[in-house]
């Protein structure tokens, strides 16, 4: 059974504050909106079997709007849930089922392919979620704890050098660097030997703390070309954003699939801008690492997605010994199909964790 872990606490009217009529109409409005993406009018609700006149339904919808649960976009007389309304629906009305057996087998088969690197497996998991959920799949890689085993600089020609760092756990990090033409094989070997002597056995985090001293030593002991290789290599492995982890995003094109109105295009453009803020997104997913189940953020509940009004559904993936490795999830419009996406995220996280054990 999927365990839900809500996002930050936001004050919304409780279910106890709504009578049976209001609860029923509210539920129908939200369900219709999540299905169609369109504002919902009173006639749509009345056709659904509610034994009330359209006028009575409109009055109830107006009451729900005054409570901050529904809103009316300026282009339509219909109503749609606010982010606060979606939060109340998810917490109080949503019925989460299970992933279909066919989809379970597909997820397991795609993640069980042999011969892939760790990062390739994570990217595949992100792609799986983006395809099944209809949003953008996201996954944060674990913090590396294995020591450095080997460092090598490989010439690629055209003024490019591939910096390769192999870890004791078998994982590999490659960084492409630009170098002036004419870098000699001896300079590449000299730089590799220098770093191997000093970084072998250290974690990447430990190696980063020593970078300043290593650069000073390189400038004193190596020729100018080899010293520059060491300096550029250490800078490349520093992670750019100062984090030992990386963020993998797949399926951004899905976010454009049903962007119809200009307002939706503007929202998607803002979401693309949000997704480019990787350090902030990793920080948000760090909160997910502490959750015991699926965590849901809706619109303005996060500062990062407050302008685009997007939702994040994510879960930690962990080993069989409950050691949290990272987080995986889906980002999309606030009208995501929560009942479908929540169990998909939960199941994919569990399969990914089992694969990491194997």
UniProtKB/Swiss-Prot annotation:
Pfam families: HrcA. GO terms for biological process: negative regulation of DNA-templated transcription. Disulfide bonds: none annotated. Keywords: Repressor, Stress response, Transcription, Transcription regulation. GO terms for molecular function: DNA binding. It comes from the Bacteria. SUPFAM superfamilies: GAF domain-like, Winged helix' DNA-binding domain. Belongs to the HrcA family. Negative regulator of class I heat shock genes (grpE-dnaK-dnaJ and groELS operons). Prevents heat-shock induction of these operons. NCBIfam families: hrcA (TIGR00331). HAMAP family: HrcA (MF_00081). This is Heat-inducible transcription repressor HrcA. The lineage of its organism: Bacteria, Pseudomonadati, Pseudomonadota, Alphaproteobacteria, Caulobacterales.
């Amino acid at each position: 059974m999927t365990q839900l872990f809500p996002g930050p606490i936001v004050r919304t009217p409780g279910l106890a504050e709504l009578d049976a009529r209001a609860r029923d109409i509210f539920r129908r409005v939200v369900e219709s909106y999540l299905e169609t993406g369109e504002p919902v009018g009173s006639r749509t609700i009345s056709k659904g079997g509610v034994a009330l006149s359209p006028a009575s339904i409109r009055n109830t919808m107006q009451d729900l709007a005054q409570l901050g649960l529904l809103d009316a976009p300026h282009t339509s007389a219909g109503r749609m849930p606010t982010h606060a309304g979606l939060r109340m629906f998810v917490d109080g009305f949503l019925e989460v089922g299970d992933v279909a057996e066919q989809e379970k087998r597909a997820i397991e088969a795609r993640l069980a392919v042999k011969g892939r690197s760790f990062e390739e497996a994570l990217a595949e998991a992100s792609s799986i979620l983006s395809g099944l959920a209809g949003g953008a799949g996201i996954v944060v890689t674990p913090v590396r704890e294995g020591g450095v085993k080997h460092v090598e600089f490989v010439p690629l020609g055209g003024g490019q050098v591939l910096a390769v760092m192999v870890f004791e756990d078998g994982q590999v990090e490659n960084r492409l660097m630009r170098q002036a033409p004419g870098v000699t094989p001896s300079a590449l070997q000299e730089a590799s030997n220098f770093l191997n002597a000093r970084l072998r056995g250290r974690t990447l985090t430990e190696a980063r703390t020593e970078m300043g001293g290593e650069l000073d030593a390189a400038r004193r002991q190596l020729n100018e070309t080899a010293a520059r290789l060491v300096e550029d290599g250490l800078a490349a492995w520093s992670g750019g954003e100062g984090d030992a982890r990386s963020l993998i995003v797949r399926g951004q094109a899905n976010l454009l699939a049903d962007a119809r109105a200009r307002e939706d295009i503007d929202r998607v453009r803002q979401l693309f801008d949000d997704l480019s803020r990787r350090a902030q997104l990793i920080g948000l997913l760090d909160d997910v690492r502490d959750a015991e189940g699926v965590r849901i953020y809706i619109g303005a509940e996060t500062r990062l997605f407050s302008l685009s009004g997007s939702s994040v559904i994510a879960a930690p993936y962990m080993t069989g010994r409950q050691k949290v490795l990272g987080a995986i999830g889906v980002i999309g419009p606030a009208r995501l199909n929560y009942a479908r996406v929540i169990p998909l995220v939960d199941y994919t996280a569990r399969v990914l964790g089992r694969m990491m054990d194997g």
